[in-house]
Amino acid sequence: MKDSSFLWYDKPASVWTQALPIGNGTLGGMIYGKVEEETVSLNHDELWTGHPKNTIRPGSLEAFQKARALALDGKLRESQDIIESDFMSTWSQAYLPLGDLVLTFDGSDRKSDYIRSLDLDTAIASVSYRQGKRIMRRELFASHPDKVIAVRLICENGKFDVTASLKCQLHHKVKSQSGLLVMSGEAPSEHNTNGQSDKQSYSKVDSERGMLFTCAVKADTDGKKHISGKGIEITGATVVTLYLTAETSFNGWQNNAFTNGKPHLEPCIERLSKNFDYEAVKSAHIADYRALYSRVELDIGSNGKDNIPTGKRLRNFKKDKNDIALYTLLFNFGRYLAISSSRPGSQPSTLQGIWNEKFCPPWHSNYTVNINTEMNYWPVLPCDMPEVNEPLIEMVRDLSVAGERTAKEMYGMHGFVAHHNVDIWRMTTPVGGCAVWAFWPMSPGWFCEHIFAHYEYTMDEKYLRETAYPIMKKSAEFYCDYLVEDKDGYLIAAPSTSPENNFVLNGSNCAVSQTTTMTMSIIRELFENCIKASDILGEDKEFAEILKDKLKNMLPFRIGKRGQLLEWYNEEKESEIHHRHCSMLYGLHPAHLITADGTPELADACRRSLEIRGDDGTGWSLGWKINFWARLRDGNHALKLFDQQLRFKASTGMNYSHGGGTYENLFDAHPPFQIDGNFGAVSGVCEMLLDCFDGKIYLLPALPDKWSDGSVRGLLAKGNIKVDMTWSGGKLTLYSLTGNGEAHIVYGGKETVHRLDGGTLTVEL
């Protein structure tokens, strides 16, 4: 159905958040669809500022030891002062724009019958319009198999002229070389700000210089062609096909990309020397994309809104929430973004996926790993795309090496550590500024939740043995050292913060506590998963026993006077009661330490915490809350949050606390744009339809009343079991399971055990 798989607009984009994204994990493009002068904003996943360097602050170990002693003594303000004055490091590096492909056409911008679209079923963007007798058509896509962005320009009933040129905000030169338009440049050596200022610098010292890059364009046409540094000029054409590719000199996080970089010009020239057949390139692209995208299909109904432009549908949704297919469209768009921004061999998806137009993007468009990067990958496994997870796993593997030195020199501890920001150079130290965001050594523990889940969904024991468990154990070793006894004999992780949130201490804000609920939840889940992995692999029993002993003595969850789950060590007054982070609820989601059935008292405390926090928030915060309410088995409240996420947002402003929604191109609005909210919504839909924990698969655990009739095909459950479901009148009518082994199915409070033999088992109710 086109109303759930097709974005279309009746005018060109005027701002970036109206443009349509394409990507192949490495190359990204944003298509405006302009008539007289088209712009395709370009990105390459490896193009960042900076170079490898040691960011460990001298004297930080002594500072940490002082801060820990002060926190345990209840001197929290003094502990925070030490952390901020003597422990913090420098800022992460920034993800950069590659440049713009500019297409300048003959004629004016007068047009009729204009349509700009993105087909989620094929991952192809299109533009079409009339100019007098001429019918102008464009197709654009980013091919993963051929590693190019392909642009097809067609004119019916006439001919056209076009000039293709390249622009760039970085230091660069453009020239004609080997029959191609070639742009080569250099990235800044440093982005040393907090992400809100336009400060980037170029060094002349080779060991400090930034990476090099090349972007090249090839043109095939039936018209006349002339190439110079100004561009590729084509006249008298009916068909033009452009193939664009790019490479950087990035050669791994440990190597200097200027002095020890990999080739970047030669691979581009070699790649474009191929005689491409456009239809073959297009067919290979569609087949490659559909191999991932077509694994899942959701149908919750349609109201025949496909004749209304997508932007108008989004605006109308505020008053008319009967456009039920808009939910499915956002679900499908999120899966499209995941495939387009993360592929085997690419870098992981950043705060903005792989799409960034700004020289100094918000928050550096980095990996913010106190929820945002993790949220990017929440829907990947339940939507049966484990391949898309690989870049994240590889980054965590890198961090497990890079963070060893940080753990040893900053904390005096074994294992490895990282904090709340990471970049392509695998920075693991805390950034500068305030402890409220910068002091958070918990990202490895959260990442280990992801890498163990990858095993649970795929059941790949070789992966668990060789990749996941060694990283998990190394992370657990750090937290074993981090734990210390409190005054009551409980093991706590001191000092600690709750990401980006403060409490009131003696009339002013304070972030540092003796420990926090999120910190303890992450450690508890990691230890439990390490014990599970040890049992599965039949090894490391001695270490598992150490973890079991520590779990017995760890500080438990606690409930406050308002019936809420406590966030900090003591019951504190929140500085910002409606704060965007709900970090104390980590045990509810993404972990399963708290469940509606297994720990009802704690689940009620989570519900009360959500009521106190309120429903509104930034875009990604709304996405997280969809997942929370689904875990609490309240599908109607989850859908209420989904409705809020579908609020239309204009392309201006920044808001740290509330006002999240969706831009016209369906990008999530923090605001500004952050892609995590898109992925949080997809994950929330999966949670409403399927939940898996303790060896059981829960079918339709939080189905909203509004989604009374529907079906879903291809969701992946833990145990590597594919699940199809059909429901009517809010009741499950049929389900199919494909996989091996026992499947413990729970529906309507009843558990049924099925034994699967690799085929498909179908059950009618």
Q: Residues of each region from the PLM?
A:
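Extended amphipathic alpha-helical segments enriched in small hydrophobics
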Residues: E461, R465-Y482, R524, W629-Q645
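Aromatic-residue-lined binding/catalytic grooves and analogous aromatic/hydrophobic interfacial grooves
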Residues: M1-V436, I451-Y455, K473-A476, Y490-L491, ...
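Catalytic cores of secreted or luminal carbohydrate-active enzymes
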Residues: D86-R110, I675-K718, K722
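Acidic/histidine-rich catalytic neighborhood
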Residues: K474-A533
